Amino acid sequence: GGTSDYLTAESYTPEDMIRAMDQAGVDMAVGCSLGQMVDNSFIAETMALHPTRIVGFGQVNPRNVDATETIDNLAQKLGLKGLKLHPTMHGYHFADHGLLDPIFDAAQRNKLVVLVNALDDPFCAPLSVEEISRSFPDVPVLIAHMGTVWNVNEAILVARRNPQIYLETSGSQLLDVKLAYRSLGASQIVMGTDWPGSDFDLERAKIARAIPDAGDRALVEGANLQRLLGIQG
């Protein structure tokens, strides 16, 4: 089994991902489905096969009538540790309390971290993420891609006034990470790769250039997410 890179339609397997991790010196990483082909069972099977290497995040379309039941299932039966939301792919505006409040309520009762795919489009502007997140301060939220390209400053602003909101760095520019680090410090930044869209070693190099302090870099490269997910060790 495996998943496809949405840019190339080439297939990649979990073993390919682990090899890329090994080459870059990465111990553990999050894996999840693409928005185009949600397969929570496959992610759970992958995590079960590689429990010390891959942490599985599930995915759901909030517009589905069984969305909250799906979240309960992916957390309680499949054992996944987080929830990815893709407003652009699934066609909803994030600042919709009627749609998103039940999703965040389900994430809260299942103690899931929420990852929001948030490039710079009107479906998922950081201020919209904040609108929902501020009603659920106990649910950690990762703004994926930091709102790249045009919403980075807004993402930094939102994270600065909401301690439960974190910025995930995949797809962002080096300067963006520097700006976030200067404004927030290291405690609300989480390194991501969007593999296979990028490579683990390239993303680590970006973080090393943006965050020269070794202790702060350790937080961004793993310790922050380790704490949010309750991973021991």
Segments from the language model and where they lie:
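A general structural detector for well-ordered alpha-helical segments in enzyme core domains, enriched
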Residues: 16-20, 39-46, 70-74, 99-103, ...
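Active-site gating/metal-coordination segments in enzymes
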Residues: 28, 36-115, 119
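Alpha-helix C-cap/termination motif
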Residues: 23-24, 49-53, 77, 109, ...
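Catalytic pocket-lining loop regions of alpha/beta-barrel enzymes
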Residues: 81-82, 94-190
